[in-house]
């Protein structure tokens, strides 16, 4: 449930307060669960209005377009009413059993990404005028002076980054 683009987690107590106060469905997107140190998946039985979404996209399998929802059966029944028929292509259907058999490999891959994320974050923090924000995802948000110039310089080095300059006033620079 870390968010994009900051990569940070909301305090569990804040999410719990929303779950207790909301009269309807609360969706927690855990697309980055493989990199986060927290999850609400184990709380689905505790909160009947909680639906957790997950995907394999963030662990290097975006092309499969495979995600899933975990919730009380009544919510899944409602989703099934609007779900398109044949919503998984044949390739994805063939790969799913292989993925399930390779959970250790996926966990190792996520661990490597977390390790490299830590190295990148530390290196960015050592650069002058760069602020790298804590993250629980597979990316690092950093504030740099003159972001368009940094973006172009990195692109010329063959390094592609997402330039968020101008997206929101709090993301300027």
Where are these regions (language model features)?
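Short, well-ordered alpha-helical scaffold segment located
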Residues: 39, 74-75, 146
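Short glycine/proline-enriched coil/turn segments at helix->beta-strand junctions
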Residues: 20-25, 46-48, 101, 127-129, ...
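Active-site pre-lysine segment of PLP-dependent enzymes
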Residues: 5-59
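Conserved C-terminal alpha-helix-loop-beta "cap" of PLP-dependent enzymes
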Residues: 125-131, 139-173
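Short beta-strands and strand-loop turn motifs
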Residues: 1-3, 28, 133-135
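A general structural detector for well-ordered alpha-helical segments in enzyme core domains, enriched
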Residues: 14-18, 120, 150
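PLP-dependent aminotransferase class I/II
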Residues: 49-126, 130-133
């Amino acid at each position: 449930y870390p968010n994009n683009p900051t990569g940070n987690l909301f305090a569990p107590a804040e999410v719990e307060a929303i779950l207790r106060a909301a009269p309807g469905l609360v969706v927690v997107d855990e697309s980055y669960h493989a990199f986060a140190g927290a999850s609400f998946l184990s709380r689905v039985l505790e909160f009947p209005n909680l639906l957790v979404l997950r995907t394999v996209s963030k662990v290097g399998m975006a092309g499969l377009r495979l995600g899933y929802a975990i919730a009380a059966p009544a919510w899944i029944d409602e989703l099934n009413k609007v779900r398109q028929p044949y919503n998984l292509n044949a390739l994805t259907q063939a790969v799913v059993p292989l993925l399930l058999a390779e959970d250790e490999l996926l966990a190792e891959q996520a661990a490597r990404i977390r390790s490299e994320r830590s190295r990148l974050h530390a290196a960015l923090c050592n650069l002058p005028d760069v602020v790298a924000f804590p993250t629980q995802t597979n990316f690092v948000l950093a504030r740099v002076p003159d972001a368009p110039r940094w973006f172009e310089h990195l692109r010329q080095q063959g390094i592609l980054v997402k330039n968020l300059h101008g997206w929101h006033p709090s993301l300027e620079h």
